[in-house]
Amino acid sequence: MSRGLGDVYKRQRLIRAWGFTYKSVAFVWLKKNKKAASWFYGLGFWTRANAEVCLLATKGHPKRQAADIHQFIISPIEAHSKKPDETRDKIVALMGDRPRVELFARQTPPGWDVWGNEVEPTAGLWSRWPEDSGKEDVSCPM
């Protein structure tokens, strides 16, 4: 699950609602411009946004397979909202070649189950957003 830094709390609630256990901010993607060596800056309400985070959540008790995986990914932006392929490569190195799902996916990479409104879902999750059991709305970070 990847998105800007805002609403991490709501995303953690959504992770729990789907039966996963939140583990960590696995990766922080620092975005570079496509054609220049400078940083990419998007829009933002308080500050001009650059970083996106990838949250790691699990089911069961998988073991970490590698201890040399670094959190930062510095990579240029690509097509709208496309994440660097390095992100998925690092997840496989970290967790091993096991079943895995990308939530809010925008493409269907080989070897991955996906779920989102821009892909044909292959993961056995809800066909719609899970209901919130609390008083706050659960927003789905797209």
How does the language model describe each region?
Residues 10-142:
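Class I S-adenosyl-L-methionine
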